[in-house]
Amino acid sequence: MKLLLIRHGATPGNLEKRYVGRTDESLTQESLEKLRKEAERIRELSGIPLAVVTSPMKRCLETAEALFPEHIYREVPRFQVEGLSECDFGKFEYKNYLELSGNAEYQHFIDTMGAEGFPDGE
């Protein structure tokens, strides 16, 4: 048995280098198109999946659908697991390093290499 782990495609926030955790945004159109083009190669690598397991986030569901479309893989069970959702970035959610520049809490986070987690997050 093979286990294939795939990160979701790009969202607008990812392209802007934002901390995208609990913000539930869709993939960009360009990312969806790229995933659809890669789908055949990925399916050749993995074969018919025994199951498709994702987080309930839009970006993950859209990635799974682009790679393993339900109309082709009707018989494959799909599971959404809340525990696979991205972490909570707290006060840093949907901000990028430029927006956080000069923020004392952000600098502390960087200086401690995140050892204490995100303020008001995980």
Where are these regions (language model features)?
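Short coil-to-beta-strand
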Residues: M1-A10, G102-H108
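Active-site-proximal alpha-helix that buttresses catalytic centers in soluble enzyme cores
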Residues: L3, R7-Y73
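Phosphate-handling substructures
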Residues: H71-E122
